[in-house]
């Protein structure tokens, strides 16, 4: 935290305001080859804001948004992170694929996760991969009359499996607490 605070750049932008602006540079992780690099660009501020000043233990934070991230904190320092594109992928799948007519439009209905459908999407992605799991959601709608909520739940289950594949190595570490925050559709699906 102190290292991050020391790297904050303070600027005055008189054309906007006389109040100083603090720019937080983010955090980079380069722990090996290109597959082991990652970065945080704002989530570190959320994590440090959520940390209990008395807690020096090991924790996981899972941020769900346009990019889903798992962040490992040890003794008040962010030591590892992994990021996926699942939030953007959900938007793309729901707006620019054959599934767009199969899922509810954002804001048109209240989100109600169908646990069995999330589990189905998760299992299908685990067995056949993400692309097939997404297509199977469409097949299930056409052949079995699943509702838009059930189809969206299957899509979220498939994306949750893809995230789990990326995140599970951090769950193998020692930790005392897990904090999930962000988009409700992802937190709901992750907790199934």
PLM feature segments, named:
Residues 1, 64-67, 179-184:
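Glycine-rich beta-strand-to-loop/alpha-helix junction loops that act as flexible
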Residues 1-37, 75:
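Short beta-strand-loop/turn "lid" adjacent to the catalytic site in phosphate-handling enzymes
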Residues 26-60, 64, 69-124:
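Glycine-rich phosphate-binding loop plus the immediately following alpha-helix
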């Amino acid at each position: 935290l102190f290292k991050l605070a020391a790297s904050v750049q303070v600027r005055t932008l008189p054309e906007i305001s006389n109040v100083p602006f603090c720019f937080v540079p983010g955090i980079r992780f380069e722990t090996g080859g290109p597959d082991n690099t990652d970065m945080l660009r704002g989530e570190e501020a959320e994590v440090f804001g959520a940390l209990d000043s008395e807690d020096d233990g090991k924790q996981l934070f899972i941020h769900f948004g346009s990019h889903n991230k798992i962040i490992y904190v040890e003794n008040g320092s962010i030591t590892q992170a992994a990021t996926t594109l699942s939030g953007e992928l959900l938007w793309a799948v729901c707006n620019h694929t054959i599934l767009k007519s199969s899922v509810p439009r954002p804001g048109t209905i209240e989100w109600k996760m169908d646990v069995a459908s999330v589990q189905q999407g998760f299992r299908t992605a685990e067995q056949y991969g993400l692309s097939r799991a997404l297509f199977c959601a469409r097949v299930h709608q056409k052949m079995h009359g699943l509702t838009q909520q059930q189809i969206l739940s299957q899509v979220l289950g498939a994306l949750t499996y893809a995230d789990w594949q990326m995140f599970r190595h951090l769950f193998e570490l020692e930790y005392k607490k897990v904090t999930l925050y962000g988009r409700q559709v992802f937190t709901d699906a992750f907790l199934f």
